[in-house]
Amino acid sequence: LSSQFGIDLSVRDAVDLDSVELPAPRIEPPAALAHRCSADRHERASHTQGKSYRDVVRASYGQLDDPPDLVARPRTEAEVVALLDWASDAGIAMVPYGGGSSVTGGVSCAVVGDFAGVVSMDLTGLDRVVEIDRTSRAARIQGGALGPVLEDQLRPHGLTLRHFPQSFEFSTLGGWLATRAGGHYASVYTHIDDLVESMRVVTPTGVSESRRLPGSGAGPSTDRLFLGSEGAFGVITEAWMRVQDRPVFKASAGVRFAAYDDAVDAVRAISQSALFPVNCRLLDPLEAAMSAGVDDGSALLVLGFESADHPVDAWIERAVELGRDHGGVVPDGIVKSGSATGNATSAPAGTAAGREGAVGAWRNSFVRAPYTRDALVRLSVIVETFETACTWDAFACLHANVIDAVTDAVNRVCGVGMVSCRFTHVYPDGPAPYFTVYAPGRPGSEVAQWDEIKAAASDALLANGGTITHHHSVGRDHDPWYRQQRSAPMGRALAAVKTELDPAGILNPGIIV
């Protein structure tokens, strides 16, 4: 990056938390809840905000101006009810908190409104897989279970939820549901919504629990009301989730394209072929170079298939054939595991398919990306992402205009920088483009610089037919553009729901409504 930017990048020391002054707590919990509440400075500091670029920058400077007064850690649903009753009666804002990985200000305690105080409700104490229905292949899981925690409990049963967002290690089932998180699957099961059988949600006015059903046409869906509500309507305490047998057969390939437009056409053909790959991520030449070590100017399509039931040879071979039909080449071949290899390369024993070559390099980079970003903050490098979805007919214009608008903003604000794009998920009717910005920041001004770039990006997304977010959620950061995207009647309807379920307005104030 130093070479690309033509400047020296020097490491800035992070501020020691012990030197940061936090305002004194304004509230005390009732005696019955005191054992679940803490005013410890490290607890309060770590629950002040999430993990967006601006959050990480502010934390590195010790700018924790709006910590919660208390952090509550309920261990039972009854304690969640008691906390909401207390908050409603005392006029205290209650911010539901899972793993704290929000990148849109969704767990920020800088709430707007006249509240006696703010409590961050950390739900990671509700972390059990309570029940497994092997016949229906479903599991009842508490909302505070972190990704690795729930998978560890499913694994002995030969099952998996198979939902792996980039925040997997530091995010919870309840957080995924509340933000409609995108996960492992690049097609079909792209969002956590698709894996929900039923949900149980505690609201300030009562408990809402939907019936366990494989499908229903009985009016508007209760689950759909709470999915994506981001803690504004209630606290998700548990859910029945559709789980799967652990995959045995896997195959992957990296298809390179000299022309990016040809790569896009290939992805569209694959997405409309009913092959339904679990991985179908297209990296533009810059992203391929930065994340996969592709140094010949090619775009890279990362393909993957998996199954617990049958070999996936025919599926990966047809997808690769479609790539070749559009000018793609496969220098590392097709890598398979758990199946007859045919003319493909077999993955070494004990390894998963797709962990070598450019595909393996991309995978490793994907896993490391959040940690790399946080380290770059100390170099005052602006490195952040934004994402969207659009129809195929709109993509070419959206891609060109967004790249132009963001590049102009980066050059204006930072003097120099880069913007890359990849597809994270694909649908028969359109892709989900995901953009990454790299630029040198001015120490002390990084947040203001990013805010200006982010505004230009968000304006361009909506102006060119995209959504303000495909899977990052609305939070506080996207709220102005979300209000433009949704209709006025829907805004009024959501406000009415908020009034009915949370009449005191204490749940995550300023979110969604």
Please provide the spans of the model-predicted regions:
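C-terminal substrate-recognition/cap domain of FAD-linked oxidoreductases
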Residues: 19, 25-61, 245, 251-259, ...
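Glycine-rich N-terminal segment of FAD-binding domains in flavoprotein oxidoreductases
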Residues: 27-28, 38-124, 161
